[in-house]
Amino acid sequence: MRVQALSAKGGGALEDIMSLTPIGGPFSDRSGRKVTTATLRELKLSHSPITCITAYDYAAARLVDQAGVEIVLVGDSLAQTMLGYENTLSVTVDEMLHHVKAVRRALKNALLVADMPFGSYHIDTKDAVANATRFVKEGGAEVLKIEGGEKRADLIRHIIDAEIPVAGHIGLTPQSVNVMGGYKVQGKNLGGIEQLMRDALALDHAGVACLFIEGIPREVAGMITAEVSAPTIGIGAGPECDGQVLVFHDVLNLTFGPPAKFVRRYGDAAALISQAVQAFRADVRSHQYPSDEESYHLPKETKAALETVLERKRAMRR
């Protein structure tokens, strides 16, 4: 069930937020069932769409999990949304793990997928498996996402052989932004389509638990989804994928630039936060916060004793 965007009708943003379906209410339809990689395949076979949202901290992850989302992705997009980097290339394994641990503590039902950041699997297979193991042992990740197509197939097999599930990621791969010459839609000509199909089939044969597809024409994404056994999760890849993912901050308008074409805003948390902070500041500056009711008080006996002590001190100074 789609959560409605903030209403423009009477009442403030806070009232609009509070009027949404309560957490754990009707739009949570998993009934507390833990999502696994097997669950994703069941959903694909039953043509039941899979939902995935990024989360990078305990509070956000807990809310997303309680809303019934099947996959929580700790994406390397946290480099931009949480750490203020220009792109995803700068974030480190240790920085990623810091956030993966926080999200792990919040989740009860959703499947935790974590991005392996740029440089953590590019040097050699031994280092890649070692880094992947850290994400599982230290971070509690259940699936690791690796960008790249058929050239990553052997590496993915090695990581899977280490008993670590892997999610593939093809199409527009942000870690390859410098090679691609920017964030450009992929697979717009026959050669590009053929390469995407080879990438998808190679990763499917390697045994990926699911396949993220980013920034490609919907027709191509539909072809891939029909050809592979792995569930496909699209972002900017049209409605034919088995599931969809959006960045938490995009969903809630917590970004500071124009959104991508595929982004749909489902709320305006930026406006709510701005209003709340401005209201707090105004109340403090006008001496309306904190009120007497929001303050702690001494017990009557202690207050009386303190007044006696203070009166004695004042008398001594006279």
PLM ranges: what are they?
Residues R2-A8, G12-G267, A271-D292, L298-K300, ...:
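Alpha/beta enzyme core
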